[in-house]
Swiss-Prot record:
<dbReference type="GO" id="GO:0006310">
    <property type="term" value="P:DNA recombination"/>
</dbReference>
<keyword id="KW-0234">DNA repair</keyword>
<comment type="function">
    <text>Involved in DNA repair and RecF pathway recombination.</text>
</comment>
<dbReference type="InterPro" id="IPR037278">
    <property type="entry name" value="ARFGAP/RecO"/>
</dbReference>
<dbReference type="Pfam" id="PF02565">
    <property type="entry name" value="RecO_C"/>
</dbReference>
<comment type="similarity">
    <text>Belongs to the RecO family.</text>
</comment>
<keyword id="KW-0233">DNA recombination</keyword>
<dbReference type="InterPro" id="IPR022572">
    <property type="entry name" value="DNA_rep/recomb_RecO_N"/>
</dbReference>
<dbReference type="InterPro" id="IPR042242">
    <property type="entry name" value="RecO_C"/>
</dbReference>
<dbReference type="InterPro" id="IPR003717">
    <property type="entry name" value="RecO"/>
</dbReference>
<dbReference type="InterPro" id="IPR012340">
    <property type="entry name" value="NA-bd_OB-fold"/>
</dbReference>
<dbReference type="GO" id="GO:0006302">
    <property type="term" value="P:double-strand break repair"/>
</dbReference>
<dbReference type="Pfam" id="PF11967">
    <property type="entry name" value="RecO_N"/>
</dbReference>
<protein>
    <recommendedName>
        <fullName>DNA repair protein RecO</fullName>
    </recommendedName>
</protein>
<keyword id="KW-0227">DNA damage</keyword>
<dbReference type="GO" id="GO:0043590">
    <property type="term" value="C:bacterial nucleoid"/>
</dbReference>
């Protein structure tokens, strides 16, 4: 068995005296592990850092085996990201989110979203809002997507300012007003599908904070609490730095 794909480094662990088990997020083969012989050498270590993108060739005798990687560098982001505390926590949180996906289950859209996020993680004006969007996309990839397109009560697609914590659906201002204390905020930038570089306007800190409140609630309900986990420290630190709460 053999395939070649690009891969974002999201983790590694020691294997034997000189090797590592490398965990990549790939567009065509999903989250995939493989052994890198000599991966702990001085030559290889800088390449195998979380946040880097590699060209990977995976080989194994059987499809279900761990297999081995041969890798070469494509985009080495780690050295750039190391200069930013926000970026370091961002890489750690992004990697932890991607590790929630089932192994070898392709999610090409999430891979592309992760690459966009990595490219902007050291930009404090953009990175926090992109992380909120990525968390929404990750929830959808896990089967817990939110419906923010129209009001759950009226079907209207304007004045959407709340989200129901029970259904994960948007609620309009008029329909939600009597229940506002029981609803989650829907910040305006999550209704805007534009992307950076094409007229996308950076949301203010208050809106980003509300975005993290929204995604954090559903991540807690569907991901962390069922696993008996608290909110990961790397997320808490990223949110604090990204919203001026540190």
């Amino acid at each position: 068995m053999q395939w070649i794909d690009d891969g974002l480094v999201i983790g590694l662990r020691k294997h034997g005296e000189t090797g590592v088990v490398l965990e990549l997020m790939t567009p065509e083969h999903g989250r995939h592990l493989g052994l890198v012989h000599g991966g702990r050498s001085r030559r290889m270590q800088p390449m195998l850092q979380p946040g880097n993108t590699l060209r990977a060739t995976w080989r194994a005798r059987l499809d279900g085996a761990l297999g081995a990687y041969a890798v070469e560098p494509l985009t080495l982001n780690a050295s750039r990201l190391m200069d930013s505390g926000l970026a370091l926590y961002g890489v750690a949180h992004l990697s932890a989110l991607l590790r929630l996906l089932p192994e070898r289950d392709p999610h090409p859209a999430l891979y592309e979203a992760a690459q966009i996020l990595i490219a902007h993680l050291d930009d404090p004006e953009i990175a926090p809002a992109l992380m909120v969007r990525f968390e929404l996309a990750l929830l959808a990839g896990l089967g817990f997507g939110l419906d923010l397109s129209h009001c759950a009560a009226t079907g209207a697609n304007d004045a959407l300012v709340y989200v129901s914590p029970k259904s994960g659906r948007a609620v309009s201002a008029s329909a939600g007003e009597p229940f506002r204390d029981r609803l989650l905020p829907l910040p305006p930038f999550l209704r805007d599908r534009d992307q950076p570089g094409s007229g996308w306007r950076t949301p203010d800190t208050h809106d980003v904070r509300e975005g993290f409140t929204l995604t954090g609630y559903f991540l807690d309900q569907h991901v962390w609490r069922p696993r008996a986990q608290d909110t990961p420290e790397e997320r808490a630190r990223f949110v604090a730095l990204g919203t001026g709460q540190s």
